[in-house]
Amino acid sequence: MLRYLADDTETTVIGAYVEGVPDGRGFYEGLAAAAAKKPVIIHKAGRTQAGARSAASHTAALAGTAELWSTVLKQAGAHEARNQEQLLDLMLGADMLPSSGGRNIAIVGGGGGRSVQSADAAEENGFTVVPLPDDVRRRVREKAPGLADWVGNPVDQSILAGSGLSSNGLLELMLESAAYDLAIANVGEDWFFGRPDASDRLKHACNRLAQICETSAKPVAVVL
């Protein structure tokens, strides 16, 4: 099935829920062949001892350890999803986002906690959260002099208030820099959605981000 989907011109992303495989070598070879052609995302269930016992009871297939599976997927060039929700999210992202051509990432928006969590998630998944480069800092100083020495990557949206530079404006500056290959744009915090004008503000923010995504040659993942 993996080889068929790899050659199918109508399939852009391959995703699979796997409990175990009867032929480990055959699975690896098919996985590597497919991953060489298009994104492949695997959710391996039965990673714990209890889960593996349950999987074996109705598949009679090789389950393997979590570490072994992670290594196999990485060597084959596939991506690992930790649960079914992440599997679907990764498949959707791989289908909609163009290839970045690099791993240097800009992270904009959200409060301090959310921006820190985004940075952790990015680096834990192999991206580099590059500090704000001099070319971007110079442009920030032109637009918001008082902000230039404070802002960094990830961008804590709370420090932008009253600066004259919006998070979307800063996102555009970062995307125009050769220092970054892609970006994450965080939209809103819990308190934001409790505002009486939250719907209108959210619509405006999303429309503006859509414009940025359309005009940028670099991928932008928007997180609501």
Over which residues does each language-model region extend?
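Catalytic-core regions of core metabolic enzymes
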Residues: M1-L224
